[in-house]
Swiss-Prot record:
One of its GO terms (biological process) is regulation of DNA-templated transcription. It comes from the Eukaryota. Disruption phenotype: Leaves polarity and growth defects. Binds to LUG and LUH; these complexes promote adaxial cell identity in leaves as well as embryonic shoot apical meristem (SAM) initiation and postembryonic SAM maintenance. Interacts with SPL/NZZ and SPEAR2. It is found in: Nucleus. Promotes adaxial cell identity. Regulates the initiation of embryonic shoot apical meristem (SAM) development. This is Axial regulator YABBY 5. The lineage of its organism: Eukaryota, Viridiplantae, Streptophyta, Embryophyta, Tracheophyta. It holds the Pfam family YABBY. Its main location: nucleus. A zinc finger (C4-type) spans 16-43.
Amino acid sequence: MANSVMATEQLCYIPCNFCNIILAVNVPCSSLFDIVTVRCGHCTNLWSVNMAAALQSLSRPNFQATNYAVPEYGSSSRSHTKIPSRISTRTITEQRIVNRPPEKRQRVPSAYNQFIKEEIQRIKANNPDISHREAFSTAAKNWAHFPHIHFGLMLESNKQAKIA
């Protein structure tokens, strides 16, 4: 964390809990003991950061609980966002829990896609000078002209379909 005594903002380094990028965040001095919302510019993850806990964890990484006098900044209407004067590691871990979107599963390729892929490889193996576009066009025509292969009924001996 950068030390700036008379500045109106404090530069803080906050790790994104989704993509693990370290973000340089300018926090107004009046919000240094509040919970602030941070958006990652890399993954656009949005989460709340307890600034007092973040500041304290940077200065004392192995603390269990600390009596910490929280100075009053702002009006009494914002006092509901102030943190208690006793902070524990449990509070910090609760702040870092994030709802991550489900991982995208790799789907099994369709019979058509699998056939086209294999057919293009076969066509290019037989004729290396053919363009990918021509090989794709030929593979699509082969798919249309050989309906028995759509259902996986193609025998190994018939696997070498003729180029249309």
